[in-house]
Amino acid sequence: MTEWQAVVLGIVEGISEFLPISSTGHLILTAHILGIKHTDFVKSFEISIQLGSILAVVVLYFNRLIRDYEIWKRIIAAFIPTGIIGFLLYKLIKGFLIGNDLVVVVSLILGGIILIFADTYCEKFCYLGDVRELPLRKAFMIGVFQSIAVIPGVSRSGSTIIGGMLMGLNRKVAAEFSFLLAIPTMFAATTYDLIKSGGSFNAQEWNILIIGFITSFITALIVVKWFLNFLKSHSLKIFGFYRILIGLVYAAFFLF
């Protein structure tokens, strides 16, 4: 992988991580288009550059995070099922699911259909306008939804936003909770993967990781702000249809 390829993947990560469209699917597809082989380092790179996206959320929500204990209670409640399931299924995810093209295609298309239906449901039944109004048991259930995102192509943000809407959060608040829940979830996943890999990267690989990190950070800052403004006057259905389209494109590249 070259430096400019790391920049492109960093931009793709920053755009797709917090939108309900699957960052994993987009990174795999982009890497294929760029001619990047899906080596162990590339797999670790795709996970590690998520730290840049995490930092963007920390920067944007820093004041709220250090002052609002009620939000942290809900983040922790939602993280519990995700942490347990992610830890138990790490080897399966790393060894089989990551790189399985059929799994990604099915996840993208099925996830798009579910997102469309969930958004329609939310038009009538989403009534909570603040994360602090969310009961802890419902926060836990959102974490269960997030656990499904261990399957490549599902989308962590997509599953948590869908879970949030089904638990009664309006679109904007569901998206915000998804952003906040990303902090412990993505940090844990990235750290665990780096420990498992032994951090055994050479100087060139570390340089590529840093470039991807910085690029994803800057891109995510812009995308998070844009997405929240978008949700003030738009639904999520467009992302559902986009997932179906990109799933078909992915299938054309990898399955036919």
From Swiss-Prot:
Pfam families, per database record: BacA
Molecular functions (GO terms): undecaprenyl-diphosphatase activity
Swiss-Prot/TrEMBL GO biological process terms: cell wall organization; peptidoglycan biosynthetic process; peptidoglycan metabolic process; regulation of cell shape; response to antibiotic
Catalytic reaction list: di-trans,octa-cis-undecaprenyl diphosphate + H2O = di-trans,octa-cis-undecaprenyl phosphate + phosphate + H(+)
InterPro entries: UppP
Signal peptide, first to last residue: none
CC annotations in GO: plasma membrane
Enzyme Commission code: 3.6.1.27
Disulfide topology: none
Membrane topology: Multi-pass membrane protein
Record's keyword terms, sorted: Antibiotic resistance, Cell inner membrane, Cell membrane, Cell shape, Cell wall biogenesis/degradation, Hydrolase, Membrane, Peptidoglycan synthesis, Transmembrane, Transmembrane helix
The UniProt record lists the keyword Mitochondrion: no
Subcellular localization, as worded in the UniProt entry: Cell inner membrane
Membrane-spanning parts: 8-28, 41-61, 75-95, 96-116, 175-195, 208-228, 236-256
Free-text function comment from the UniProt entry: Catalyzes the dephosphorylation of undecaprenyl diphosphate (UPP). Confers resistance to bacitracin.
Family under the similarity heading: Belongs to the UppP family.
Miscellaneous comment text of the record: Bacitracin is thought to be involved in the inhibition of peptidoglycan synthesis by sequestering undecaprenyl diphosphate, thereby reducing the pool of lipid carrier available.
Name of protein: Undecaprenyl-diphosphatase
Originating organism: Aquifex aeolicus (strain VF5)
